[in-house]
Amino acid sequence: MAQELKLGYKASAEQFGPRELVELAVLAEQHGMDSVAVSDHFQPWRHNGGHAPFSLAWMTAVGERTERVQIGTSVMTPTFRYNPAVIAQAFATMGCLYPGRIMLGVGSGEALNEIATGFQGEWPEFKERFARLRESVRLMRELWLGDRVDFEGEYFTTRGASIYDVPEGGIPVYIAAGGPVVARYAGRAGDGFICTSGKGMELYTEKLLPAVAEGAAKAERDVADIDKMIEIKISYDTDPEAALENTRFWAPLSLTPEQKHSIEDPIEMEAAADALPIEQVAKRWIVASDPDDAVEQVKAYVDAGLNHLVFHAPGHDQRRFLELFERDLAPRLRALG
């Protein structure tokens, strides 16, 4: 059965402090969003004006203040500064508190967050980071069965470990992928798949989504059962100049993947990002002041097969964005589903 079209809100933990970020999630539910997803950074991508509240504390606060939205990370790295057994316990607890509403979105990690918190040695290449991710997911799922777990992995070990409070069925795990290797893994092992917009439609139509389908087929799964989430970078405002200028804070998104994965210091990240021209920064975003134009650009992702659209707005006035989204974009987007 095909997944229904869902509209979500990206809570930008790099841009807002914890109390404001909770209030924005509450507003997102009030404005009709189906989900709220939060980034999980120890350090932001900007030193000046940046924030980095702890995602799990935020999720619990949002759970207490909301009634229906799905709440999750997009994304967390459960492999370096975190012990995946403890992450499994934390998410199981939230799953008991807010049944059916919690998801865990995971990725392979960035040096910015892990080296500051004590990772020693050379930052690992993709092969090791991916192996750690797979092993952590396997361990967390074993723990969510509620049994005593003796786990002997290459990177993680448990001895008679049990999680005593686990929601029935465990916690859905969403795998973030920027290329076909991890996308195949998402199809094979993920309850959901996460990607981000603005990288050329052929990436989604020719690489990522076919890889998800290939992974699902190899695991004898129905790819239609996998929630296909995309973070859509959208700067929508009825004022065209504001729509363009609002992207400036998020210039780090326009750095190369190598820069984003290897830069260790937010001051260095900020300097590299601020050297970029606004035109290059804006290329990662749907920048629009006409609602039909905005929805037409989003529609391409729906047509590609992505069903869970999580909207990341770059401006500081998120209340305005949520009001405009509900008024101008949501009705048009719902009609696509």
Swiss-Prot record:
Source species, domain of life: Bacteria
Binding positions (coenzyme F420-(gamma-Glu)n): D40, T77, S108, G109, N113, G178, G179, V181, V182
GO molecular function, one term: oxidoreductase activity, acting on paired donors, with incorporation or reduction of molecular oxygen
EC annotation from Swiss-Prot or TrEMBL: 1.1.98.2
Active-site residues per Swiss-Prot or TrEMBL entry: H41 (proton donor), E110 (proton acceptor)
Keywords, comma-separated and alphabetical: Carbohydrate metabolism, Oxidoreductase
Record GO biological process: carbohydrate metabolic process
Transmembrane segments: none
Binding site for substrate: T196, K199, K260, R284
Reaction(s) catalysed (UniProt annotation): oxidized coenzyme F420-(gamma-L-Glu)(n) + D-glucose 6-phosphate + H(+) = 6-phospho-D-glucono-1,5-lactone + reduced coenzyme F420-(gamma-L-Glu)(n)
Subunit field text: Homodimer.
Family designation: Belongs to the F420-dependent glucose-6-phosphate dehydrogenase family.
Biological function: Catalyzes the coenzyme F420-dependent oxidation of glucose 6-phosphate (G6P) to 6-phosphogluconolactone.
Protein name, entry field: F420-dependent glucose-6-phosphate dehydrogenase
The species this protein was found in: Rhodococcus erythropolis (strain PR4 / NBRC 100887)
Lineage: Bacteria, Bacillati, Actinomycetota, Actinomycetes, Mycobacteriales
